[in-house]
Amino acid sequence: MILVEHATVITVDGERRVFADGSVLVDGSRILQVGPSREVHPPREPDRVIDGSRLVVTPGFVDTHVHLSEHLNRGLLLDDIPVDRYLPDWLIPLYAVMTAEDEQHAALLAGIEMIRTGTTTFCEAGTLFDTSAVADAVERLGMRAILGRWTWDLESGPDRMRQTTAEALAANAAMLEDLGARDGLVRGWPLLLGFGTCSEELIRGAKALADRHGVGWGMMHLASHPSRRTRDRLPLATLDAWGVLAPNAKLSHMVYLDDADIARLVRRGVKISHCPTAGLKHTKGLAAHARVPEMVRDGVCVSLGGDSGNGSNHFDMLRMMYLVANIYKDARLDVRVLPPETVVEMATIRGAEALLMEREIGSLEVGKRADLVLFDRDAPEWRPLLNPLNNLVYAATGSSVRSVMIDGRLVLDEGRITTVDERAVYDRVEVLARDQVRRAGLTVLNRWPLRP
């Protein structure tokens, strides 16, 4: 039993309660009590008491769209690579030579970054090959995750990526059986690549597979960039006609939408993963075209995604929240658009809802899983603490995260990762990254030459 007492607690519960002097009592993997400190009474002596008088406590953040494997080559791609050359010239060669060890260490690196910045649950975008090996790495970290394998039915490209429709569906079925048998924090979903790479049969089959296993399914790239409208803007009306739009569907990016599209998302209960950092860097036209405020206004579940090591280049949810809270205010010339309270919901309870976990995570409530983030108030961005939500969204970054609890376990304790040897991961990543680039036949580019 762990008691965090006398903290500023942002619950994101049904009443959106915030306590200036609050406590959270954790018993095993679940929250036993949460409320004003004067009302939280442990039934026995806690195993540990954490003084929260200089802490801010929030629910763990939920990142609904991450490419784990690309963390191994973070920073490799310069920011002036044309969007239509990004995948074929750079990512495909890297993925073609990706080993299980590469994927594991990329996952460890990405996971450490997420933990250190307050993310406790994530959904991989669907770009893994050895999902079992990656699941082992995620379990070592102690994170909650949904994983997906590389899924399309193209018969061109590198040998390991060629898949018929039947092969793609069979591989996903095997993954769901494997991860489902683990009965732990890691689960699997069918997650399709997008980019016009998936047939109707594959999309229908993925949805049927998800329904059969009682999980969600998703498409990685949809309506994401103006230059790809003819390739990846599969009309939502078509997906609807195929019967695949449903509450267990999660679509990513979704920049180019009209009113009819939004109405269809509302009607079908489809979930959206919005990736602000990658969207801006890849010039997707967020400020000019994205309908995020309108989706939120009309009741679409919109969550946040960090995307990739060369897309956003980081997985700091606080930086994503800051962008979302500001981009659309300026775009609409309206300071009332997406207030900090709404953005915090997007990073917590809406993320949980997008991953079909809202009954288990996303808020600090009795009976829910104990996923908590403890921020250190002794940092300049937290002072003075007049409005905790304003400080959280507009001032803080992940650097002030002090401790993180996932499923009742402190995976970050007073600034120290407790589950893996952090330095050993960093050292091995340096070796693997350079070897992967060499095997892919790519060149590391630096506009300012990196001299010996």
Please give the residue ranges for each predicted region.
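Active-site microenvironment of metallo-dependent hydrolases
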Residues: 1-22, 26-32, 37, 43, ...
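Divalent metal-coordination and catalytic microenvironments
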Residues: 7, 24, 29, 54, ...
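Active-site gating loops and adjacent loop-to-helix segments of metal-dependent hydrolytic enzymes
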Residues: 72-104, 149-166, 226-248, 268-271, ...
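Alpha-helical scaffold segments that flank or form the walls of functional sites
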Residues: 74-143, 168-182, 430-435, 441
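Metal-coordinating catalytic core of metallo-dependent amide/deamination hydrolases
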Residues: 134-262
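His/Asp/Glu-enriched, well-ordered alpha-helical/loop segment
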Residues: 241-248, 293-382, 395
